[in-house]
Amino acid sequence: MVHLTPDEKNAVCALWGKVNVEEVGGEALGRLLVVYPWTQRFFDSFGDLSSPSAVMGNPKVKAHGKKVLSAFSEGLNHLDNLKGTFAKLSELHCDKLHVDPENFRLLGNVLVVVLAHHFGKDFTPEVQAAYQKVVAGVATALAHKYH
């Protein structure tokens, strides 16, 4: 559960309505793989991840980034029940994929950077604070199965 004020919730939803999920998702996942290269080990089947340009141009990275951000988008519709919304993904990432749950926090922070890059002045400190709450809540929900 994420506790947002009505103003924070409005800010998150207003900005999210402008997000190109495919573009932002691909960039966010790509940046995660470049900035934190140890996360690449979960994406062996994605082909060439040998350089930042290879990662950022990789169609499988872009496609999976879109998939990740689509799930995040669904979570925005259920801020009062993030654990329930992400229960199956938490189980998958814990039991089958064995992803370090810290990676969820890292991806959330990278997403905030990408949103700031894309929205510039519209991504005010207040909007950032609201998004930090949301990505922290999503990361906690995705890590729930690990506890």
Curated annotation (Swiss-Prot):
Family the UniProt entry places it in: Belongs to the globin family.
GO molecular function: haptoglobin binding; heme binding; hemoglobin alpha binding; metal ion binding; organic acid binding; oxygen binding; oxygen carrier activity; peroxidase activity
Modified residues (Phosphoserine): 51
Keyword entries, A-Z: Heme, Iron, Metal-binding, Oxygen transport, Phosphoprotein, Transport
Residues annotated to bind heme b: 64, 93
Gene Ontology annotations for the cellular component aspect, listed alphabetically: blood microparticle; haptoglobin-hemoglobin complex; hemoglobin complex
Protein name: Hemoglobin subunit delta
Example GO biological process: hydrogen peroxide catabolic process
Species assigned in the record: Otolemur crassicaudatus
InterPro entries cross-referenced by the UniProt entry: Globin, Globin-like_sf, Globin/Proto, Hemoglobin_b, Hemoglobin_oxygen_transport
Subunit structure and binding partners: Heterotetramer of two delta chains and two alpha chains.
Stretches assigned to the Globin domain: 3-147
SUPFAM superfamilies to which the protein is assigned, alphabetical: Globin-like (SSF46458)
Claim: Oxidoreductase is one of the keywords in the record: no
